[in-house]
Amino acid sequence: MSQNFSFRQAAVIGAGTMGRGIVMCLANAGLDVQWLDSNPQMLNQALGAVADTYAHNVRQGRIGEEEAAARRARITPVQHLAAMREADLVIEAVYENLELKQSIFRELDAALKPSAVLASNTSYLDIDAIAAVTARPRQVLGLHFFSPAHIMRLLEIVRGAQTAPAVLEAALALGERMGKVSVVAGNCHGFIGNRMLEPYATEARLMLLEGALPYQVDRALQAFGFAMGPFRMYDVVGIDLEWRARELAGVGQDQPAVQVDNRLCEMGRFGQKSGAGYYRYAPGSRQAEHDTEVDALVLRVAETLGYPRRDFADEEILERCLLALVNEGAKILDEGIAARSADIDTVYLNGYGFPAAEGGPMAWADRLGAAELLQRLRFLEQRHGARWKPASLIERLAAEGGAFADLQEAR
């Protein structure tokens, strides 16, 4: 017998930037929210930050005083998991460490009522590995919010191997209630958005070693219509997030593509928040300023790694970044991680600043045509190696004269 799930009482674990945004999303949508963090001082600071955000919204005329007070009143700090027993939904929003998340889910599984749904805000970790430590894997899923969560509209809803259809339906209803654009993704490393971001960012980073400079790569992509290029994006998000994740996992720090990032982080240049990353920022400013010190660093790293440098045209920068996105998107589509190409486009239009006029990476690729796409990928494979091997789906579409938009997997 299928069970229906309705979310009235929610809870959030984690009082960092993501936790704060998620709490506001839930409170803004009319849910009562309990909030827990292992550091009471951090939780108090986060409550203050939420109050400040609501006060700012009142000053801006976005909401009235009464509505701000009502939203604040829906948020209740708690000191232990037992206080969350009656929650219908708990969203974990701690930092990206699988063992930590598994530990939290074990405790939640033991403490919460049997009907509660457990969600992780992980941006790339294995949802099935998290669900496996509970006795309720059918009631575990990913709810990947994008930062800042109370502003960004995209929500990736990640279905695990055992996630019940009714749980997915409840999550979609919650997304609609919060005013989100929701996309259901299958479980894999990075899901849809961040899995595709990895080869895109890798190409951008490798082009630095081969002869391009950060401002040049960003300029080419912004001229195409991206809200910001990859290096400006990493400055906003924080260069140190991936750096710390690599350190924690003990994997990937020796890859040539991340050596400029590593040097920047070792210098304390974490991005906008530290006043310097790939760009410089004046005190209190978000305006990115070209920094010749970073250009010199790129040249030193490339020389140390033995990369011969050459001139780059904007067209090559654009092609390598876009085709990296599309080739990975084709694999995601073929594997059933995304049900349709339009879902991939929705993710990139609403979460990654892809130009709306282009319709998303897969729509852009369909206009190019599968045969042309395959030809360009084969050229890049010959020139740069196996990472450019065309996705099997692209080969099939080229042979059949088909398009990504023709494909749709019934769910």
Please give the residue ranges for each predicted region:
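N-terminal glycine-rich phosphate-binding loop for ADP-containing cofactors
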Residues: 1-411
